[in-house]
Structures are given as C-alpha cells and as structure tokens.
Regions:
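Active-site capping/gating segments
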Residues: 18, 23, 96-98, 106-136, ...
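Conserved SAM-binding loop of SAM-dependent methyltransferases across substrates and taxa
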Residues: 1-15
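Active-site segment flanking the S-adenosylmethionine/decSAM binding pocket
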Residues: 52-80
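Conserved beta-strand signature within the Rossmann-like core of class I S-adenosyl-L-methionine
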Residues: 83-98
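Short helix-capping segments at alpha-helix termini
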Residues: 11-13, 35-40, 81-83
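Short loop/edge segments at beta-strand edges and connector loops
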Residues: 47-49, 93, 113
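S-adenosyl-L-methionine
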Residues: 20-60
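An accessory alpha-helical subdomain
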Residues: 132-227
Length: 227
C-alpha cells in the first residue's frame, strides 16, 4: 500500500521512490494512498514481478519485505543485474532467514547490520546488506580486500560462519536481547519436543531427536556468545 514509500519521502530519507508489486490490486491502493499525501511526483508505481521492472542504475537501494525467505531469494537471484556494487538491500523475510543470510554471503553481499524485534508474540528480522564487486564472494576472494576496506565494510568476525548464517552475526555481535529472548524460548520448546520424542520409537524419531539435539547445542553456543 506504499506506506513505507510514503514514510521514506515524508521523512526525507529518499528523494524519489519506485513502489512495485506483482499484482494490480495493491498498486491501485498504493496510488490512492500516494495521491492522498500529494506525493505522486516523487513516488512512482510499477507492476513488477520482483525487481524485473527496474533498470540497472535507476535505484541505489531496495526494500523487500512481507514474504517468505525463499521468495526473497528468488527475487534477489532474478534481479542480480539491478543490485550492483554499492547497492543497499533492506530485507525482512518472514521465514527461511538463515537461507537468506547464506544467499547474501555466497553472492557478494555483506550484511552490515541486523535488527530483531518482537510484536504481538511474533519475531521479525530486518537485515541491511551492501552488494559490491561484481557479485564476487567477499569472504573468499583476496582481491576484494582493498575494495571492502575502502567501502568501510568489515569482513572479519569472531562469529563462526554457520552460526552467523543461522542466528545472525550482527545480532550476536551486538548481544541482542531480543535474539536472546527468542533463543531461550526456542530452547525450552526444543526441550519439550525432545521429551515427547523420547517416548516414541522408530528410525524417523531417532533422526528427529538428533536434529533437536544439534539445534539445542547450537543455541546454547549462541547464548554463551550473547553473555
């Protein structure tokens, strides 16, 4: 409904915005809201499947939110020609968050900040990432070291890569109290699941118990890092 676009322009955070949706219905609502604020000259609406309606170089940042992580990844993968070096990505996937972090890491985008919040019993993650260097891996390519330093991007971290993918390197580094709360709740839930599984039998039960134990150990590791 273009609420974010309107907010960005009204607060002076963006000069111009392109608000896009894959369906015409939401775009009609967006246009109505944009017109009611008198921002029709600064906010353009486009029918677009992901980032396909954007021309490379036309924008310098994108916000993708309100959908599952796999769809976010699909949009990013198909729109790689748009998010070139220095492009800013603000992402808020509703699921598959570790997969989104991993995709960014493996496709030349560095997560430079992440926030986690809770509202009405639900947790939300907001990831800020910057792309650069023609999609080369910033973690494995020595040739990107100078470029990342010039961009002010720190690629060094004491957080193991897998842990960072699964739980958020930046959240751990800033010792996020919301992440801690989520993990304590998750650990308690896993304990209950393990207890119930221990009373059942079968090969699948054994495999599931191993998965629960592995996740519990990871969470305990992260909780130690959050102290």
């Amino acid at each position: 409904h273009a609420y974010t676009s309107i907010y960005l322009v009204e607060k002076g955070l963006a000069q111009n915005v392109v608000a896009m949706d894959v369906a015409e219905g939401p775009l009609k609502s967006a246009r109505k809201n944009i017109d009611s604020f008198g921002l029709g000259e600064r906010i353009e609406t486009r029918l677009s499947d992901g980032m396909t309606a954007l021309v490379p170089g036309e924008t310098d940042a994108a916000i993708i939110a309100g959908m599952g992580g796999l769809l976010v990844i699909d949009i990013l993968r198909r729109g790689m020609n748009v998010w070139q070096s220095g492009y800013e990505l603000i992402l808020s996937p509703q699921s598959e968050i570790p997969e989104v972090r991993r995709f960014l890491r493996e496709n030349g985008a560095k997560i430079i900040d992440e926030h986690m919040m809770q509202e009405d019993g639900k947790y939300y993650n907001i990831i800020k990432a910057v792309s650069y260097d023609e999609k080369q891996s910033i973690y494995n390519d020595e040739n990107t070291a100078d470029a990342t330093e010039e961009a002010g991007i720190d690629t060094k971290s004491s957080v193991p890569v897998v842990i960072g993918d699964n739980y958020g390197e930046k959240l751990i580094e800033k010792k996020s109290p919301v992440l801690r709360q989520y993990l304590v709740e998750r650990l308690e839930k896993l304990s209950g699941i393990y207890c119930r599984l221990s009373k059942e039998t079968g090969e699948r039960v054994v495999d599931r118990m191993a998965e629960v134990s592995q996740e519990s150990r990871e969470i305990e590791t992260v909780l130690e890092l959050l102290k």
